[in-house]
Swiss-Prot record:
The active site is at residue 100. The modification Phosphoserine is found at residue 100. Mg(2+) binds at residues 100, 239, 241, 243. Disulfide bonds: none annotated. Catalyzes the conversion of glucosamine-6-phosphate to glucosamine-1-phosphate. Belongs to the phosphohexose mutase family. It catalyses: alpha-D-glucosamine 1-phosphate = D-glucosamine 6-phosphate. The lineage of its organism: Bacteria, Bacillati, Bacillota, Clostridia, Eubacteriales. This is Phosphoglucosamine mutase. It is an enzyme of class 5 (isomerase). InterPro entries: A-D-PHexomutase_a/b/a-I, A-D-PHexomutase_a/b/a-I/II/III, A-D-PHexomutase_a/b/a-II, A-D-PHexomutase_a/b/a-III, A-D-PHexomutase_C, A-D-PHexomutase_C_sf, A-D-PHexomutase_CS, Alpha-D-phosphohexomutase_SF. The keyword Metal-binding applies. One of its GO terms (molecular function) is phosphoglucosamine mutase activity. Coiled coil: none annotated.
Length: 445
């Protein structure tokens, strides 16, 4: 697989790239590195609904127990729920088996520290070095020193109670909820109903194969139609591991992470609760977000793509709200990672407080036209370093000047290069983006 850790843990095609053997070795190395401070460590493990989850979980657990660590198994649970339980169960570390919004054949393994944060690059590198190394620095336990598996039967209930504690009653709101047949398929509709929301559920019947299949935050088309058909106040869509949220307004229009951050930031600022009067976003956020927040006296910090980098900037600046256009949004006062259900509840709370339709709240931001084209490539690094691609990007930058921007970046989790162009005229932007894409494709031949 080359370098194991990407921007969101280890990802690959399950049983081909991410094999049980690799999961076993990651379990051993991860447990050893993350548990050095603990004499008999305990590690939380959870997963999404993919068919390969059971296989990889079994291998991972075997690796962890073989170095003398106990496993706290929480079963199917959203990624942010696993981060929350890692903290509150006072575990030494947490592990999520999920490939988030990726298709069913993929899976992933992602570690959390004892505080519920994603691991720093240096710690991931230490784990990776051990996975590749023939040296095994840990002692081999026998007898009573081998790790046990402890089932956490009420894991979903604990997470739902935490979520409910962040807002008041949401009675009177009608929502179409799309669980992407993923980790939030049960807890999503349940927590909404317990808060008084009228819920029309979509894609909440996982069968191991249908996760993210034409549903969820990356495929909101069915949700858009359902919101209009049911005359709902809004639609909410999570992805496979429910660490992101995309909303749909009452007219069936997409309300992405940029709009959600603007809505929540303005509401928090109005109540004097926006720490540092600041928000952290990535370079992919629309220029319209920058304009809307600047007009409200809110400072915007920008970082590279990846919610781990958003988190680092939040900790550095003292801001408490940050996220990505894709819907990874971090409310640091409540949780240590992007949390799709938490974000949904905060958004619904603003809706209830202000008594306005979500389309009116979203109108505070005017989105500038933006074109994003994903190009599948054999070698991301080679494509990104190609001089002809660089030359074309510089040409587009000069043409746009201050009227827009162009951004070319490689995906952290897939073999893709993303070309994003933003400006005033959509048709013109399509042509500019395509001109960059054409060079990337030409150089692939």
């Amino acid at each position: 697989m080359g370098k194991l850790f990407g921007t969101d843990g280890v990802r690959g095609v399950a049983n081909k790239e991410l094999t049980p053997d690799l999961a076993f070795r990651l379990g051993q190395a991860g447990a050893y590195v993350l548990s050095k401070e603990h004499p008999h460590p305990r590690i939380v493990i959870g997963k999404d609904t993919r068919i390969s989850g059971d296989m990889l979980e079994a291998a991972l657990i075997a690796g962890i127990c073989s170095v003398g660590a106990d496993v706290l198994r929480v079963g199917v649970l959203p990624t942010p729920g696993i981060a929350y339980l890692t903290r509150t169960l006072k575990a030494s570390a947490g592990v999520v088996i999920s490939a988030s919004h990726n298709p069913v054949q993929d899976n992933g393994i992602k570690f959390f520290s004892s505080t519920g944060y994603k691991l720093p690059d240096a710690v991931e590198e230490e784990i990776e070095d051990l996975v590749h190394s023939h040296e095994k620095p840990w002692a081999i336990p026998v007898g009573s020193e081998i790790g046990r598996v402890i089932e956490i039967q009420d894991a979903q209930r604990r997470y739902m109670d935490f979520l409910k504690g962040t807002v008041g009653s949401l009675a009177g709101i009608k929502v179409v909820y799309d669980g992407s047949n993923g980790a939030a398929s049960h807890v999503g509709p349940q927590v909404l109903r317990e808060l008084g929301v009228e819920v029309i559920p979509l894609s909440v019947t996982p069968d191991g194969i249908n996760i993210n299949a034409g549903c969820g935050s990356t495929h909101p088309e069915v949700l858009q139609q359902a919101v209009i058909e049911h005359k709902a106040d809004l639609g909410l869509a999570n992805d496979g591991d429910a660490d992101r949220l995309i909303a749909v307004d009452e007219n069936g229009e997409i309300v992405d992470g940029d709009f959600i951050m603007v809505i929540c930031a303005l509401a928090l600022k109005a109540k004097g609760q926006l720490m540092e009067d600041s928000v952290v976003v990535t370079v992919m956020s629309n220029l319209g977000l920058h304009i809307a927040l600047k007009e409200a006296g809110i400072r915007v910090y920008e970082t590279q793509v990846g919610d781990r980098y958003v988190m680092e900037e939040l900790l550095k600046t003292g801001a408490r709200l940050g996220g990505e256009q894709s819907g990874h949004i971090i409310f640091l006062d409540h949780n240590t990672t992007g949390d799709g259900l938490l974000t949904a509840l905060q958004l619904l709370a603003v809706l209830k407080e202000q008594g306005k339709p979500i389309s009116k709240l979203a109108a505070k931001m005017q989105r500038l036209p933006q074109v994003l084209i994903n190009v599948r490539v054999k070698d991301k690094k080679k494509a990104m370093e190609n001089p002809y691609v660089f030359q074309k990007v510089e040409e587009v930058k000069r043409f746009l000047g201050e009227r827009g921007r162009v951004l070319v970046r490689s995906s952290g989790t897939e073999s893709l290069v993303r070309v994003m162009v933003e400006g005033q005229d959509h048709e013109q932007l399509m042509g500019l983006a395509q001109s960059v894409v054409d060079i990337i494709k030409r150089e692939e031949l």
